[in-house]
């Protein structure tokens, strides 16, 4: 059974539910303090929260911690690396994913359920979805406005949409270019996404649509 490290920085607050989602998806998971090593694990998740209270920029300080050197090695070795919300911000700050997360177009914290369109199923985290599938997850962020100079040169995995899959301005909660909600590296083993799949991993929570992210990751790590 693949083992996953869920990295905990000062200010991380989505670690317990992320561990639970991985276990429900068939993997083993442990919370790992950022000063410890993750080398013995098969994959790594950087969960949501407010690492270092978002000082300087969201994710900026966490991205410069020593543990990120091991995360970089994971990425280069082809092992799965998932960044959720603040974790996505950390991955862009560390240069492991292209682009940047800027303050929301309307400068306030946004917490609500949204629809996503699955744009790329050829990644370690989306192989169990159908291309074009519409899924539902919550978001909770103040700096989720994704920007990249040339969107045509990146792998867009998730896009904000309406319930019918239309990529409208109204469906875009934060002003992200091309309604982008999640991107991967060229190899497809590193994914950053602003929506919270761990909060959509049980019907009791309102949706199980996010569970496939973790199930896909577990299946990928078995290879």
Curated annotation (Swiss-Prot):
SMART domains: GATase_5 (SM01211). InterPro entries: Class_I_gatase-like (IPR029062), PRibForGlyAmidine_synth_PurQ (IPR010075). It is found in: Cytoplasm. GO terms for molecular function: ATP binding; glutaminase activity; phosphoribosylformylglycinamidine synthase activity. GO terms for biological process: 'de novo' IMP biosynthetic process. The keyword Protein biosynthesis does not apply. Part of the FGAM synthase complex composed of 1 PurL, 1 PurQ and 2 PurS subunits. Part of the phosphoribosylformylglycinamidine synthase complex involved in the purines biosynthetic pathway. Catalyzes the ATP-dependent conversion of formylglycinamide ribonucleotide (FGAR) and glutamine to yield formylglycinamidine ribonucleotide (FGAM) and glutamate. The FGAM synthase complex is composed of three subunits. PurQ produces an ammonia molecule by converting glutamine to glutamate. PurL transfers the ammonia molecule to FGAR to form FGAM in an ATP-dependent manner. This is Phosphoribosylformylglycinamidine synthase subunit PurQ. It comes from Pyrococcus abyssi (strain GE5 / Orsay). The gene is purQ.
């Amino acid at each position: 059974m693949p083992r996953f490290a869920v990295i905990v920085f000062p200010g991380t607050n989505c670690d317990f539910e992320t561990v639970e989602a991985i276990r429900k998806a068939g993997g083993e998971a442990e919370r790992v303090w950022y000063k410890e090593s993750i080398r013995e694990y098969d994959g790594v998740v950087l969960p949501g929260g407010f690492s270092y209270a978002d000082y300087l920029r969201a994710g900026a300080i966490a991205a410069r911690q020593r543990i990120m050197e091991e995360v970089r090695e994971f990425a280069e070795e082809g092992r799965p690396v998932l960044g959720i919300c603040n974790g996505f911000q950390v991955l862009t700050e560390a240069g492991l994913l292209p682009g940047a997360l800027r303050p929301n177009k309307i400068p306030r914290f946004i917490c609500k359920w949204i629809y996503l369109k699955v744009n790329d199923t050829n990644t370690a985290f989306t192989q169990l979805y159908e291309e074009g599938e519409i899924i539902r997850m919550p978001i909770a962020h103040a700096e989720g406005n994704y920007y990249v100079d040339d969107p045509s040169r990146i792998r867009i995995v998730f896009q904000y949409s309406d319930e019918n899959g239309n990529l409208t301005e109204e469906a875009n909660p934060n002003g992200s270019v091309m309604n982008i909600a999640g991107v991967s590296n060229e190899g497809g083993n590193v994914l950053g996404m602003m929506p919270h799949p761990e909060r959509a991993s049980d019907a009791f929570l309102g949706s199980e649509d996010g569970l496939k992210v973790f199930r896909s990751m577990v299946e990928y790590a078995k290879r």
